[in-house]
A protein has these predicted regions:
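Amphipathic, charged-and-aliphatic alpha-helical interface segments
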Residues: 44-58
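Mid-chain, well-packed structural core segment of small domains
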Residues: 55-83
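A generic alpha-helix surface/boundary motif
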Residues: 24-29, 45, 59-63, 79
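Acidic, glycine/proline-rich low-complexity segments that act as flexible tails and inter-domain linkers
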Residues: 1-43, 69-70, 96-114
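Residues at alpha-helix boundaries and short interhelical turns
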Residues: 37, 54-58, 72, 89-92
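Hydrophobic side chains within alpha-helical segments
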Residues: 48-51, 67, 80, 99
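C-terminal structural segments of small proteins and small subunits
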Residues: 79-104
Length: 114
């Protein structure tokens, strides 16, 4: 059985302990989503960032802001994506997300130069 350091998300270990086949199927499904060729990877991460803002999921916000930067997003693109949630989901969720997004963005490895 994999160790705690083998999990990408905190929910994985307890899920795997109780429902290993479900966890494996979910991991496979998520891997297929990550391998989509369109939209491009930066847009993909910005969309997933917006989804985590809407869900008010700070760990997800940090993760997708980090991944967005690692694939070339600028801070203005991250912040602009967050602000696009305000008409439908309100200002509070966006404002709360900003510090989590900044933490993730700042923790990212710089994008590779072409």
């Amino acid at each position: 059985m994999p160790g705690s350091s083998d999990w990408s998300f905190p929910f994985e270990e307890p899920l795997h302990e109780v429902f290993p086949a479900l966890h494996d199927a979910q991991s496979s499904w998520l891997s297929q989503i990550d391998s989509l060729s369109a939209p491009d990877r930066k847009t993909h991460e910005l969309i997933r960032l917006v989804c985590t803002v809407i869900l008010r999921n700070p760990p997800g916000i940090r993760r997708h802001a980090q991944l967005a930067r690692e694939v070339g997003a600028e801070w203005e693109e991250v912040l602009g994506s967050i602000m696009l949630t305000t008409p439908a989901f309100g200002m509070l969720a966006a404002v709360e997300a900003m510090s989590h997004a900044r933490d993730g963005f700042d923790a990212a490895r710089p994008p590779e130069a072409d």
